[in-house]
Curated annotation (Swiss-Prot):
It is found in: Cytoplasm. Part of the phosphoribosylformylglycinamidine synthase complex involved in the purines biosynthetic pathway. Catalyzes the ATP-dependent conversion of formylglycinamide ribonucleotide (FGAR) and glutamine to yield formylglycinamidine ribonucleotide (FGAM) and glutamate. The FGAM synthase complex is composed of three subunits. PurQ produces an ammonia molecule by converting glutamine to glutamate. PurL transfers the ammonia molecule to FGAR to form FGAM in an ATP-dependent manner. One of its GO terms (biological process) is 'de novo' IMP biosynthetic process. Part of the FGAM synthase complex composed of 1 PurL, 1 PurQ and 2 PurS subunits. NCBIfam families: FGAM_synth_I (TIGR01737), PRK01175.1 (NF002252). GO terms for molecular function: ATP binding; glutaminase activity; phosphoribosylformylglycinamidine synthase activity. It comes from Picrophilus torridus (strain ATCC 700027 / DSM 9790 / JCM 10055 / NBRC 100828 / KAW 2/3). Its main location: cytoplasm. Residues 6-248 form the Glutamine amidotransferase type-1 domain. This is Phosphoribosylformylglycinamidine synthase subunit PurQ. The lineage of its organism: Archaea, Methanobacteriati, Thermoplasmatota, Thermoplasmata, Thermoplasmatales. The gene is purQ.
Amino acid sequence: MDSKRAMVLRMEGTNNEEEAFLSLKRAGFEPEYVHINDLARKRKFIDDYNLMFIPGGFSAGDYIRAGAIFAARLRPFLSDINKFIDSGRFIIGVCNGFQVLTELGLFFNGDRKIALTVNESNRFECRFTYIRLSTKKVLSGLGNRPFQVPVAHLEGRVYCDNKTLDELIENDQIIFRYVDNNGNYSGYPWNPNGSIMNIAGITNDSGNVIGMMPHPERVYYPYQMSGNERNSDKGTGEIFFRILYNST
């Protein structure tokens, strides 16, 4: 594959596919919408792509729990997905996509060691906050500065036991943490869901499976951002997706 082909995977209830598609395209990828039925009917194949992007939304209405049904629909392709990961190619799951990756256990070689549970506020949280890179594994071009990002979720609180948290820290798998506008770790509302250690996103041990609750695809341009951030030279999304492109 000479070009970097990106699959934007969708099913009933996903959203933000268009924002994801356009962000990937503007960053240099060659994106393509792929419905879960395209895989099931062998019209399209995971191995034909360099990157898989699982967008946000409410897949299958979030029945049972967020991301559970989408993950069940993907489980027949788990062998192909693991080969995709082992080859060094990237999977990105944003919001509902993060929930899907969690259900599949892709951060811990098939083990479901974390949960994304209901926000501490017990309500849907939809607004801007900030995140900061917290790993040296991947996306190092983001540096140490805070980035404004929108969040929109009810079940985004990262929860795990102490042993798993120690593993995440030891293996440098916490990729993003919520911060305030000065880059300091802070509680609600900057941490919109009460995630342990302000975790906004994690990776697998290799750094090529990334799950995050915030939506960089919604702020590709500065005018999509809030307050003084609208005066930035580039939107958070452009910075994120261009660095992602260079990492793949």
